Amino acid sequence: MLADYHVHSEFSDDSVFPVNDVCALAIVRGIDEICFTDHVDFEIRPDWDEYRADPSCAPIIEGQPSINVDYERYFPTIAEARDRFAGELTVKTGMEFGVQSHTIGRFDELFERFAGEWDFTILSIHQVGNQEFWNGTFQQGRTQDEYNMGYYEEMLRVAQRFDHWSVLGHLDLIKRYDQAGPWPDANARDIVAEILEEAIRRGKGIELNTSSIRYGLTDLTPSTELLRLYRDLGGRILTIGSDSHKPEHLGAHIPMMRERLKDIGFTEFCTFQDMEPMFHKL
């Protein structure tokens, strides 16, 4: 079984890939199941009702307004795709929640507002204190130790206080935006172990994000060392996702990454249904 559990579409501000086109291409590529995981990052992007009331509230990125998922269109569109491609492709409904400790309440409200719609959610830390990693705002004025530890400290806070998530997304994402060079996993081993123990205790998991290859990273995301730590702590829930935003990303490198997971000692991966993990042999 081939599944891609980190897929963006036209409903993410950084993708223009139509839902039906994603599904059609997945079938061509021999993918059995996908889960749409479009972006929501409260206080970074406005919701569509906020944007319609005041277009100036949306930041402009690469010439386009940056807005959260259009919820009222998102869920019906995915449901229609699920019916349209039934028998050829299993289509699941998810989102990638870019949570910060001070926005947990808004994500609780969003999840409860659409109760019954969710198969899967990714908990990602994309910002701390509304400061972004991708543009270096969070790193500015901090030492390499400070911004790396600050990232993991925020992840721990959120993982402890927020419950509506399935897996931790790209666990060591901060590496992608670290211009100071390699920072040893050993420096964060204790706090990452605490994060992973919290996930395991809550019945949550982590993802292997295959975008490490297209970003030119020298290791997996999360790293081989952190994946081994998760395994050694007893972690079993593990999804694999391409973090696709464009056609060329969809399903990329997943078969190879499954072999890497076997080498590390994993024997299973997960898909999700109604927020519950389903285990499959690697």
PLM regions with names:
Residues 1-101, 177, 182-186, 210, ...:
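An N-terminally biased module of ancient metal coordination in phosphate/nucleic-acid-related enzymes
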Residues 1-9, 19-24, 129, 159-160, ...:
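Charged catalytic cores and adjacent phosphate/nucleic-acid-binding surfaces used
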Residues 34, 91-93, 121, 206, ...:
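Hydrophobic/aromatic residues located in beta-strands of well-ordered beta-sheets
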Residues 38-39, 125, 172, 273:
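Residues that line or immediately flank small-molecule/substrate-binding pockets and catalytic motifs
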Residues 48-202:
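Extended substrate/RNA-proximal surfaces in nucleic-acid metabolism proteins
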